[in-house]
Amino acid sequence: MGLLSDPVRRRALARLVLRLNAPLWALPVAWLERTMRSVGLEVYTQSFSRKLPFPDETHERYLVSGTNVYGILRGPRAASTESLVLTVPCSSDSTNSQAVGLLLALAAHFRGQIYWAKDIIFLVTDHDLLGTEAWLEAYHDVNVTGIQSSPLQGRAGAIQAAVALELSSDVITSLDVTVEGLNGQLPNLDLLNLFQTFCQKGGLLCTLQGKLQPQDWTSLDGPLQSLQTLLLMVLRQASGRPHGPHGLFLRYRVEALTLRGINSFRQYKYDLVAVGKALEGMFRKLNHLLERLHQSFFFYLLPALSRFVSIGLYMPAAGFLLLVLGLKALELWMRLHEAGAGPDEARGVPGPSLAAPPVQGVGLTSLVAPLLISQAMGLALYVLPVLGQHVAAQHFPVAEAEAVVLTLLAIYAAGLALPHNTHRVVSTQAPDRGWMALKLVALVYLALQLGCIALTNFSLGFLLAATMVPAAALAEPHGPRPLYAALLVLTSPAATLLGSLFLWRELQEVPLSLAEGWQLFLAALAQGVLEHYSYGALLFPLLALGLYPCWLLFWNVLFWK
């Protein structure tokens, strides 16, 4: 590669890094415009603003306004029909200034080459993911999150691939790659293989989930480390969060990765020149694309960078769990049929042709109240926390974000009283047939939801199935009711989220105390609601409108009178 082999370019990069060595407390829009124009790019800006549904205490923001800066390098050998993106996110507390310097150095180097067959967009976004979302919505002429932004004055071709860069230091020990995107989407596996190839060619250490590749697969340590990496990916994908700017590109069918420079205590370190060479190699390969990346897998799990688990291997695991629900529903259907027939007829013995008493119906009207009240509780869980935050903050000494979380927990806990409310309007005819019919409906409802989730986000579907299916199959009003109730509570969606947080930190080798875990759980609830309204993450509405009402049906079955 010819990147920065010239000493002049090395000194230019050193000056940029020195200029940007302090954090960018505010994006230097005018300076970025001048610098990009000086290297020969078409430079444009985009202003945007967004009012969050409630204050984001993690990033300390509520009314957000910022400016994105991007420069376009026109491909001299193309007609601006396709493009590539190199993006660097910045925020008020960002330490990503070294990545901005490397982006500008790459822009200056790419400008002097004549082999580009695609436009290259160099994008610096303000307020990290909010700026990225504003730019993507304006570029594709859509508005899915309600963000207000100015129209883009300059455009390139259809975006084929994107790379997001985050560097916290001008020297690194490894590059960590992040693939998990919004709602569990993943980039094409070929893009990840391309990154690994150029890291190996340049001698760069590349990591996945912050962990190096296992070197010894013959001993037990290698498979255990791979299992740990695999579980970390499953938990990150199941969260549905965009774990980097690349996660928002995937929504628009743009294959993207986020690369993070890690500066640890390892002895061997690499400067920005080595990172720039790897990026140049990736962009030169992507420049030769004749069509979008599609030959490799879009559904996979990664125990290591050099190994993957394809959809054909892991999907049967979810299928067998859903089969349990199907078999249990079939059993209940047969029991309902036998309960409606006479004892001889149930055994297949013909009886005398006497006038039989009227067969007792299933009592479908008795199911209307539990179904409606369960869905109403789910709708309240989705709507009321954000709508009632100001009222709660006025009457209680809490902030808006705390009011949202406390309202969520209050409505969630109020659902435990559901059986005592619904039994007042439920018909007392055929109580056994009533709970069996309700459980049959709940099993089919749960199986359909988990099946659809597993098709789009396997990690989330599998985690929910592994926790909810056993309790759902066992729940009935006969038997050890306290044991079944404890099992249902421990496998509820909220308990699954809490347990996943503890498992996540344990796999990261940063264990939590109970108090720290509870605080992290409350912060995760607030972030889940914010990400739904800010980026369109579907985990919160899925749990509130789908799985929580379904779980309440099983809770109702357990306490059926």
What spans do the regions from the language model cover?
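Second-shell loop/turn segments in exported
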Residues: G2-L4, A14-L27, F54-E60, T87-N96, ...
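His/Asp/Glu-rich mid-to-C-terminal helical/loop segments that flank catalytic regions of hydrolases
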Residues: K201, R236, R251, R260-G351, ...
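Acidic helix-start/capping segments at beta-turn-to-alpha-helix junctions
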Residues: Q46-T58, I120-E133, K211-D221
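Alpha-helical transmembrane segments of integral membrane proteins
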Residues: I311-K561
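A non-catalytic alpha/beta surface segment that caps or lines the substrate-entry region
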Residues: L4-P76
